[in-house]
């Protein structure tokens, strides 16, 4: 009996050779150790043996099984090692070769300007508010003191989607929504984002452009607070040596309203002024529609075009360059903070 079992193990060893594949080895395992395998079938003989010989026979079978499994496992490991070495040869890396330089990306100039303003106002305690670009007429116009028959609506040639929805013409509806949500509590926010109007695209106009509006509402807010805020923002953006000039203007959502000019020195050393934004004290009607008592609360608001800032700050002469995705233009802003 022992010789028969040993011959089974020997027959397996005789079938092992270097040309076998992993599939061949699996087939051999099934042939010898499978449910109907050569060695497995020997187990049925144990029933015919005397009781005193059964333990010894069982031990022979187990030893043979371990031997067969070991032979197959060793050969599998050899094949796997060969395959791994072949793969490593294909993936050999010459560490003496110079490395490849990855092209550095850059932030879009409008992103740079937006992040700069956000960082500045967050440092002053403001929150950054967001809102939908597809807006309801109620928030875009009505809550900004622009009733359906208000003549100032003619100033907005808008992209209407339905009778009551449009692509927002300014980021003021973000303010309206925030006021409504705040339920009469003090707020200080900025609202940057894309806006849309039916302007023909040229060097100074675009049907899509970006704004950043600011809104502060609290008790005892004065025009002096607005002026100091505008001065601080102008100096942060354009330099500490700048000053501002306020000119009376008109906006339906503020009263009084002003246009804000920022000083600069021309090539002849002469101080000149350039208009950069509009601002004013929040109109009482806007406060009321937003859920605030104008006898208790006052506020100020301002709005500035982000393309306007980028054009002045980076000396860009055509607003269309912001939206053409021309890498020759965008690559100029690598490393700009």
Curated annotation (Swiss-Prot):
Query: What are the UniProt keywords, alphabetically?
Result: Aminoacyl-tRNA synthetase, ATP-binding, Cytoplasm, Ligase, Magnesium, Metal-binding, Nucleotide-binding, Protein biosynthesis
Entry-linked InterPro entries: aa-tRNA-synth_II, aa-tRNA-synth_II/BPL/LPL, Phe-tRNA-synth_IIc_asu, Phe-tRNA_ligase_II_N, Phe_tRNA_ligase_alpha1_bac, Phenylalanyl-tRNA_Synthase, tRNA-bd_arm
Taxonomy of origin reads: Bacteria, Bacillati, Mycoplasmatota, Mollicutes, Acholeplasmatales
Record-stated family: Belongs to the class-II aminoacyl-tRNA synthetase family. Phe-tRNA synthetase alpha subunit type 1 subfamily.
Q: Please name the GO terms of the biological process aspect recorded for this protein, alphabetically.
A: phenylalanyl-tRNA aminoacylation
UniProt xrefs under NCBIfam families: pheS
* Keyword Protein biosynthesis attached: yes
Record flagged with keyword Phosphoprotein:
no
Q: What does the entry's cofactor note say about binding and number?
A: Binds 2 magnesium ions per tetramer.
Using the UniProt record, name the top-level EC class of this enzyme in a single word. ligase
Q: What is its EC number?
A: 6.1.1.20
List localization entries.
Cytoplasm
Protein name in the entry: Phenylalanine--tRNA ligase alpha subunit
Q: Write the gene name.
A: pheS
Subunit architecture: Tetramer of two alpha and two beta subunits.
């Amino acid at each position: 009996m022992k010789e028969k079992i040993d011959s089974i193990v020997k027959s397996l060893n005789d079938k092992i050779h270097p040309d076998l594949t992993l599939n061949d080895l699996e087939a051999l395992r099934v042939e010898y150790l499978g449910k109907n395998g050569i060695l497995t079938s020997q187990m049925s003989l144990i029933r015919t043996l005397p009781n005193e010989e059964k333990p010894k026979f069982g031990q022979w079978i187990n030893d043979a099984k371990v031997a067969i499994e070991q032979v197959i496992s060793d050969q599998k490991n050899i094949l796997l090692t060969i395959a791994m070495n072949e793969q490593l040869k294909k993936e050999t890396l010459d560490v003496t070769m110079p490395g490849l330089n990855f092209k550095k990306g850059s932030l879009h100039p409008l992103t740079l300007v937006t992040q700069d303003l956000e960082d500045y106002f967050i440092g002053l305690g403001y929150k950054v508010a967001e809102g939908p670009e597809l807006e309801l007429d109620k928030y875009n116009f009505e809550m900004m003191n622009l009733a359906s028959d208000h003549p100032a609506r003619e100033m907005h040639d808008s992209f209407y989607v339905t009778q009551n929805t449009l692509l927002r013409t300014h980021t003021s509806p973000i303010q309206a929504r925030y006021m409504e949500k705040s339920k009469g509590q003090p707020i200080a926010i900025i609202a940057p984002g894309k806006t849309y109007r039916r302007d023909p695209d040229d060097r100074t106009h675009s049907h899509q452009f970006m704004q950043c509006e600011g809104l502060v509402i609290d008790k005892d807010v004065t025009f002096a607070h607005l002026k100091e805020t505008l001065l601080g923002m102008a100096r942060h953006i354009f330099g500490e040596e700048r000053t501002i000039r306020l000119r009376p203007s008109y906006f339906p959502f503020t009263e009084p309203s002003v246009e804000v000019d920022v000083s600069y020195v021309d090539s002849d050393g002469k101080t000149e002024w350039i208009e950069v934004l509009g601002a004013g004290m929040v109109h009482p009607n806007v406060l009321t529609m937003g859920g605030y008592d104008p006898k208790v609360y006052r506020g100020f608001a301002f709005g500035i075009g982000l393309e306007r800032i980028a054009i002045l700050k980076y000396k860009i002469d055509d607003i269309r360059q912001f939206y053409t995705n021309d890498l020759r233009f965008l690559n100029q802003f690598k490393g700009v903070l």
